[in-house]
Structure formats: C-alpha cells, structure tokens
Amino acid sequence: DDFSTMPKTKRAIRKKQMATEAAASAASDKYFFFYSTRSPFSNFHPASFVDEEGNLFFCSEQYMMYHKALLFEDHEIAELILSEQSDPMQCKIAGRAVRNLDNDIWLENARQIVGQGVHLKFSQNPSLKAKLLATNNLTLVEAAANDRIWGIGFPASKALTVPTKIWGSNWLGQVLMNARERIRHEDDKERL
C-alpha cells in the first residue's frame, strides 16, 4: 500500500497495526510478527523478481496465484494474473477463480510453490534479503487474524497472550524461515 494515496483513516489504522506488530515483536526474544503489506515478509509487499521461465512478478502473491492457476492448467487465469502489474488483491481474486481447483491438491503443493516464490523474491532483492537475514533465528509469524493456514489466526496484539499450541499453521512464516536458511546456505557456499 502507498501511504500517500491512502485515505487518512486507513493510514491511521495501518500505522497502528504496524506499531502493534513492532511492539509485539519487541516484547518477544523468540518471535518476529508481521502482517502489514508494508512488511517485506508480506506476500503483498512490492518486490520485482523473475522466475526460471523469465516471467516478471511484482510481488510473491502474484507468483503464488500464477502458479496455482498453472497447477490446475487454467492458462487463461494464469495469463490474467501475469498481466496484472501492481495490485496483489487482483491476483488473489483471480486465483480464487481458478477452474478445476482441487483444494487437497492445492494444499499439497502450496508451500512448495510459495517457498520458491519467496526464495526468488528475497534472493533477487538485496535490501529485502538483508531484512530477512537480519531476523537471525527468530520465528517469523504472520499475525493474520483471519488466516489459520498461512498465518496464526491471531493479530500480533493477541498472539503473545494465547498459548502457541492454539495458533494456526503459520505456513507463510515457515516458508520464509526455510528461504532464510536456503539463502544463508547459498551465501556460505559463495564465500567458499
């Protein structure tokens, strides 16, 4: 989201949300909470990168939805998603319209697909890569109150007040931490 074009009330809500995430992360020596699209860890955060076929993506949400459409051989929706140039929500909406979707197959493949997109995003953007590596060994937590699969099902303001065993799956946090380890390993190999 571009703060300069956002209505004043929406800007205030986003600033409060980011402050809450920062406060919750600061209160923990174990977790780093994120959710806002201004966070580099969000799939909606703008970050250009190219996949193995030379396709240009403007965010990892676009990559995810494009590959979701390809998984189910919906080339029309895939092209629609790839043609989007700046709005991750439009990609998400198009991804929900994928024909022949089998949710079990999607759930079996989603983490691998998103993991590859996240790796490309961070490995091709040095400033984002530095931010990911700066999280050291903290557990990255998507504090999405309405998502118990990719997030934990709680906002950052509530996350530390409930037992972690009742958190959602946090798949996005997991793929980010896997990407962090993969990038560290690649960097170590380059130094040798």
Regions found by a protein language model. Give the residues of each.
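Charged, low-complexity intrinsically disordered segments
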Residues: 3, 7-192
